[in-house]
Amino acid sequence: MSTNTDYAALALRVSSGALFIAHGLMKVFVFTIPGTVGYFESLGLPGFLAYLTIAAEVAGGLALILGVATRAVALALIPVLLGAVWVHSGNGWSFSNEGGGWEFPLFWAVIQAAIALLGSGAYALKPSAP
């Protein structure tokens, strides 16, 4: 029998997973892979990190939605989000600022920590151990 906590974990897991997939696919289809690699390099980061970021966002988002290795995936996505905090740190706090501030990626990192603590919740393909 599922509890309210299980359904809360499900809501966080699925909504967060959908956002990760959307952001990963945006890097592929809107910014393009070469554009994303170029952007990473313009920040002084190695270009291969763009590929790792895209893979983490798409695969991690799918794993969250399906409820597979939920705790590990949520924890693994936190460094990606902290990298986004760093990227957006020069734009100020508010995400509505030009270039996007760092409030959204920081909040999203906190959500991943909550998902890691809660586990997969209801309707997971591979439920987390309590």
Where are these regions (language model features)?
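Extended, low-polarity transmembrane helix blocks
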Residues: M1-F29, G47-A55, A59-P130
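Membrane-interface interhelical connector segments
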Residues: F29-G44
